[in-house]
């Protein structure tokens, strides 16, 4: 017989209070809340299951699914914010705080509406008129007790408005992966000790209910979703309460800093306010589990100044006593509660006076943070500030060798005061330094903070607070906040912080269409235009990959797992920076490749010593350094440390050689002629500039302000510029036979000299050498003559310059920490320096024809071959290529700048993944020429003229072929007269359609007479011409908006009856037209034809400005609107042709071609007119040879009209 043992059920009387208290904490923090209630202008986070369990109104709302599941936002119109605050406090704490009789009435009315029975009965209760607030507590068994709270003073903030602690952002991210994840109550609360239960019991027996928190506790919560790092930096010298630091335990807390510290429970006899004992004590940042009362750990021992801790991030906690006997809860009436310390400003209670004193620091006024006087870095304690200032002071005055030492100048970030730049010391919390930094790291943590979200480490920018997953992404983003913008545009004066930004911007200059659709092979300028195209024409929704989610919170496989576009490589060659005479590094490599013996001496201008920084001479060389601590606005000669020692002899030798080569290359084109190069040696006198162990570079500009730039990998670069520069500082160091040209005069040099300097400063391959050798030979003599002419006047220029020179010094930081001596990349600091409103670097802007074509001859050959072709009217008139030849400058080679080769800042998108698809342009060119030849010979008698064409005869040269016909219309009357006189003996045949008299031999070239129908009906609004009145009437409906034809099925109206008939086929649902490529069916035949262009690639719509083909008419119209906008105000229009130039420089270059053509035509016309006058005077008009002479004269004139 089996005997069953007796068992009894064990019940936790405090479980419900514990769970309700934790839920209330989650509501205050906004954690795991799945619904947002909006009352007036305040947002309240709450749990839908708790609200449904407490209110019938919320139960019906949530069960009826009337709220959108994705947002779960509910708005209550008839309630007040302060009333709903009290209702939420009651729901989550079973406590109602009654402050005045009006509040009772409002709570009773709200309780009736929301279906809360306890609040409905509040109106029947009688409250005294005492000013002290009443706290009505309802226990678990339903017993209601009323007690008058006289211990706390009345909070004035309570009666002023609603509690804004409950206001959270609707789109605020939750810490859980799903907004509707269930609450795991066992993970966090099953380990609550008996001592905590006893404490909660004592708190319930106290006279004040802790859940009834006044508004003043808002300072402790302060949007607890913010990271620990930000809170630690924003509130120095404060102990963050456990409710504001983390509040997450077990699985809810993803941070490694969570600690479960159990405070000592020793009764104390001190007073409640013990601020004097704990006011200056540094407290660690820890977290602990939260129950009914707020509990904080014991503070760490006070650290003395002489004994710093081994790691600033180490926090020592008191060890939990394992042998301490557990306190079993007994009857509430039998146990004597221990001594509890209550806060006088809020409802918090603590076990010891130490914890209370640490908590009282939150209620004290904000103190000024401890800021380093050298780098403006903030610290939380004075001890840490003293240690940091000792290191910062030594590092700012001591030069550091370029090995494993970190950079003194990281990328600059604006400090708290906004007036200076921070130092490389870390701005992250001191507790994270041991984890995130290493001794040999080349990058410091001054630019980011680290925070943990859902267990994932994120790097946050200290300037804009943006978060990044990887540190390299943050480093790349840091250029945006830097004042050094190292990526200039190749076509305008804009400078960008990232190479990706520059690439996106330059697309609008070049007009390249690099994004190609893989379905129809149509190309687009930007990815967004491509995406809209695929959505409209291919029915592809790119949002499917991020919006389709499964019921359990996972993601579906994307519908389009492959990339739906092809990114074509860059076809347009980038323009060079004409401001540089050469690039220092590329020129040095180019000389080594060409094995040219460099000239031995170059004289650097000796600027006035009164305005120069202090120079220290070491081993006969000039050393110039600058301190990184000087702000940008401060000139470097005001207290600048200039002592720098040579630490690396091998590196110095390499840098001396690089400096020697750089100086030679920068002076090779602008000073010495190609035939006679200057040969001298680098002397030991102070004429060469170097920066200690690092090299200097001298870059001469073609702009108005030449500059001398000295850059270093460790220290700040110093840029000296002047309004004019002295080329000859010491005449004793230079022989009078050596011609030296002033850089201030180089800007006036001829284009040939500019071309030679550009070609000589770059290493060339075999193909480029073949192209440029004839050019250099042709320009040697002119450049030699020009340099020789400048040799005599150089002395006068020097004297004037030395009197008016003005030196300004800027401190420019390196482009990136990677631009060290080993990377062979010089900092591009000269690009960003500005003097006044005008930049130093002047870039030469090329013509608007930026597309590079292979096989194009060099510019000098084109100019030589253009003159005889223009002088020969026979070849010019008969050649149809003369009508469509491009007159703009073409670039014969590509130019790569240092910023283009920067490997540390690559674009995100793979710009160079695909090889260019070779397309045969020759066939398209032949078809275009043949088409123009046929259309250009027609007689445009009845066509409307271009408005500006009456004053400009060459308006139609670059227009659409219809414009060519209109252009020929100007010169047709003399041609008609010649034909009539030539065939005056033939009988005249009259055309019945156009009433024009034409001779039988009118088709002299074998072409018949073509009838052009007149259009007598003209629209008064847009001046369009029509053949009949009915067509004009139909056209007028476009202006009046009249739509007389209505669909009987859907009621849609149309202005043309044919459009209505096409529309009615849609309602029939018959799709008779099927695509032969993809078997797709269409209702209309024209829709099928448009669709088939996707497969055939036919581009039947051409721009009338630039002859670019388009697949659709709407795309062509949008493209033409851009031309119109540029013509109206954004571009620079030519007055002799419809050419639109993007810059004034390109317009001037384009107008020079018209000038040469006009002079040539004018000379030819004068000669022919003079010949004609002589013939008319010598012979009578009735002579038989007169017609032959006139025929010889008229033919060249007619051919000239088409040029």
Curated annotation (Swiss-Prot):
Covalent cross-link Glycyl lysine isopeptide (Lys-Gly) (interchain with G-Cter in SUMO2), where: 43, 145, 148, 151, 260, 549, 556, 750, 755, 796, 806, 813, 834, 842, 849, 915, 971, 976, 984, 988, 998, 1024, 1033, 1116, 1139, 1142, 1157, 1190
Zinc finger (C2H2-type): 341-363, 370-394, 459-481, 487-509, 515-538, 1017-1039, 1045-1067, 1073-1095, 1101-1123, 1132-1154
PROSITE patterns, sorted: BTB (PS50097), ZINC_FINGER_C2H2_1 (PS00028), ZINC_FINGER_C2H2_2 (PS50157)
GO biological process, alphabetically ordered: DNA damage response; negative regulation of DNA-templated transcription; positive regulation of transcription by RNA polymerase II; regulation of DNA replication; regulation of DNA-templated transcription
Ubl conjugation as UniProt keyword: yes
Modified residues (Phosphoserine): 130
Composition bias type Polar residues, residue spans: 269-280, 581-598, 607-628, 635-644, 731-741
Keyword Nuclease on entry: no
Name of the protein described by the UniProt record: Zinc finger and BTB domain-containing protein 38
Organism annotation: Rattus norvegicus (Rat)
């Amino acid at each position: 017989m089996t005997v069953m043992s007796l068992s009894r059920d064990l019940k936790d009387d405090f479980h419900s209070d514990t769970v309700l208290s934790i839920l209330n904490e989650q509501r205050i923090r906004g954690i795991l809340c799945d619904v947002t209630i909006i009352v007036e202008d305040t947002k309240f986070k709450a749990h839908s299951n708790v609200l449904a369990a407490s209110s019938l109104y919320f139960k019906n709302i949530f069960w009826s699914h009337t709220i959108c599941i994705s947002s779960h936002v509910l708005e209550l119109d008839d309630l007040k914010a302060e009333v709903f605050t009290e209702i939420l406090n009651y729901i989550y704490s079973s406590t109602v705080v009654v402050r005045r009789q009006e509040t009772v009435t409002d709570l009773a009315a709200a309780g009736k509406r929301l279906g809360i029975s306890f609040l409905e009965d509040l109106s029947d209760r009688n409250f005294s008129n005492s000013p002290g607030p009443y706290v009505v507590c309802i226990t678990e068994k339903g017993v209601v007790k009323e007690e008058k709270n006289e211990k706390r003073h009345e909070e004035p903030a309570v009666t002023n408005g609603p509690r804004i602690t409950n206001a959270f952002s609707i789109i605020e991210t939750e810490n859980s992966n799903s907004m509707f994840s269930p609450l795991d109550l066992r993970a966090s609360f099953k380990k609550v000790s008996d001592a905590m239960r006893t404490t909660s019991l004592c708190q319930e027996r106290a006279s004040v209910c802790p859940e009834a928190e006044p508004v003043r506790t808002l300072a402790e919560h302060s949007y607890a979703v913010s990271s620990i790092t930000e809170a630690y930096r924003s509130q120095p010298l404060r102990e963050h309460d456990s409710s504001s630091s983390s509040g997450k335990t077990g699985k809810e807390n993803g941070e490694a800093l969570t600690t479960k510290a159990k405070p000592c429970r020793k009764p104390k006899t001190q007073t409640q306010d013990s601020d004097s004992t704990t006011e200056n004590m540094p407290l660690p940042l820890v977290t602990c589990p939260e129950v009914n009362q707020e509990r904080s750990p014991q503070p760490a021992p006070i650290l003395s100044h002489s004994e710093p801790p081994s790691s600033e991030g180490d926090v020592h906690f008191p060890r939990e006593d394992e042998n301490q006997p557990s306190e079993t809860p007994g009857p509430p009436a039998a146990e004597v509660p221990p001594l509890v310390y209550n806060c006088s400003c809020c409802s918090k209670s603590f076990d010891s006076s130490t914890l209370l004193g640490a908590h009282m620091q939150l209620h004290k006024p904000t103190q000024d943070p401890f800021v380093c006087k050298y780098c403006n870095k903030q610290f939380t304690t004075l001890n840490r500030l003293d240690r940091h200032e000792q290191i910062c002071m030594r590092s700012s005055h001591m030069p550091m060798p370029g090995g494993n030492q970190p950079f003194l100048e990281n990328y600059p970030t604006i400090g708290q005061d906004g007036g200076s730049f921070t130092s490389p010391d870390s701005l992250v919390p001191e507790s994270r330094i041991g984890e995130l930094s290493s001794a040999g790291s080349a990058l410091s943590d001054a630019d980011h903070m680290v925070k943990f979200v859902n267990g994932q480490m994120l790097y946050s920018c200290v300037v804009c607070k943006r978060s990044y997953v990887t540190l390299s992404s943050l480093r790349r983003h840091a250029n945006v906040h830097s004042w050094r913008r190292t990526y200039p545009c190749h076509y305008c004066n804009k400078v960008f912080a990232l190479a990706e930004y520059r690439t996106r911007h330059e697309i609008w200059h070049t007009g390249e269409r690099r994004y190609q659709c893989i379905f129809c092979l149509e190309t687009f300028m930007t990815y967004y235009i491509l995406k809209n195209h695929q959505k409209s024409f291919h029915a592809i929704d790119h949002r499917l990959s991020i919006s389709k989610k499964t019921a359990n919170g996972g993601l579906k496989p994307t519908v389009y797992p492959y990339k739906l576009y092809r990114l074509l490589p860059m076809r347009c060659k980038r323009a060079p920076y004409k401001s540089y005479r050469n690039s220092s590094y590329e020129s040095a490599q180019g000389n080594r490749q060409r094995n040219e013996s460099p000239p031995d001496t170059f004289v650097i201008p000796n600027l006035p010593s009164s305005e120069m920084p202090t120079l220290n001479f070491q081993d006969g060389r000039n050393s110039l350094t600058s301190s990184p601590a000087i702000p940008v606005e401060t000139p470097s000669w005001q207290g600048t440390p200039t002592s720098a020692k040579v630490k690396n002899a091998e590196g110095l030798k390499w840098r001396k050689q690089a400096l020697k080569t750089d100086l030679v290359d920068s002076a090779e084109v602008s000073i010495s002629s190609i035939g006679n190069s200057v040969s001298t040696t680098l002397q030991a006198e102070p004429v060469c500039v170097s920066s200690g162990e690092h090299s200097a570079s001298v870059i001469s500009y073609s702009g108005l302000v030449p500059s001398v730039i000295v850059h270093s990998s460790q220290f700040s670069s110093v840029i000296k510029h002047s309004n004019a520069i002295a080329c000859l500082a010491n005449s004793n160091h230079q022989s009078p036979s050596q011609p030296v040209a002033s850089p201030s005069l180089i800007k006036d040099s001829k284009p040939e000299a500019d071309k030679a300097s550009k070609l000589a400063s770059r290493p060339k391959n075999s193909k480029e050498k073949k192209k440029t050798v004839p050019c250099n030979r042709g320009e040697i003599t002119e450049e030699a003559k020009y340099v020789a002419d400048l040799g005599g006047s150089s002395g006068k220029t020097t004297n004037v310059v030395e009197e008016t020179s003005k030196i300004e010094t800027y401190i420019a930081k390196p482009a990136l920490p990677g631009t060290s001596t080993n990377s062979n990349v010089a900092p591009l600091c000269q690009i960003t320096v500005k003097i006044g409103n005008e930049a130093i670097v002047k870039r030469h802007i090329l013509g608007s024809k930026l597309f590079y074509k292979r096989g194009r001859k060099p510019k000098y050959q084109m100019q030589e071959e253009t003159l005889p072709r223009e002088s020969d009217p026979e070849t010019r008139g008969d050649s149809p290529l003369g009508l469509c030849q491009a007159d703009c400058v073409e670039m014969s080679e590509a130019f790569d700048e240092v910023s283009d080769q920067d490997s540390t800042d690559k674009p995100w998108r793979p710009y160079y993944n695909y090889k260019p698809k070779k397309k045969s342009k020759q066939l398209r060119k032949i078809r275009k020429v043949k088409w123009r030849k046929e259309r250009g010979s027609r007689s445009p008698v009845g066509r409307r003229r271009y408005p500006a064409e009456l004053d400009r005869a060459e308006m139609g040269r670059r227009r659409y072929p219809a414009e060519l016909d209109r252009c020929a219309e100007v010169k047709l009357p003399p041609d008609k007269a010649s034909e009539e006189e030539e065939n005056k003996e033939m009988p005249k045949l009259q055309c019945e359609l156009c009433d024009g008299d034409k001779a039988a031999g009118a088709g002299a070239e074998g072409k018949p007479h073509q009838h052009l129908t007149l259009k007598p009906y003209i629209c008064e609004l847009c001046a369009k011409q029509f053949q009949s009145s009915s067509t004009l009437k139909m056209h007028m409906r476009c202006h009046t908006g009249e739509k007389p034809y209505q669909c009987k099925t859907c009621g849609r109206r149309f202005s043309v009856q044919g459009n209505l008939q096409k529309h009615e086929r849609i309602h029939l649902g018959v799709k008779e037209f099927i695509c032969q490529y993809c078997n797709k069916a269409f209702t209309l035949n024209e829709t099928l034809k448009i669709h088939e262009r996707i497969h055939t690639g036919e581009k039947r719509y051409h721009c009338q400005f630039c002859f670019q083909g388009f697949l659709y008419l709407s795309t062509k119209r949008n493209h033409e609107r851009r031309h119109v906008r540029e013509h109206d105000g954004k571009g620079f229009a030519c007055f002799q042709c419809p050419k639109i130039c993007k810059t004034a420089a390109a317009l001037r270059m384009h107008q020079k071609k018209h000038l040469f053509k006009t002079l040539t035509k004018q000379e030819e016309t004068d000669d022919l007119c003079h010949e004609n006058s002589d013939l008319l005077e010598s012979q009578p008009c009735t002579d038989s040879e007169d017609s032959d002479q006139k025929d010889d004269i008229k033919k060249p004139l007619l051919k000239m009209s088409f040029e």
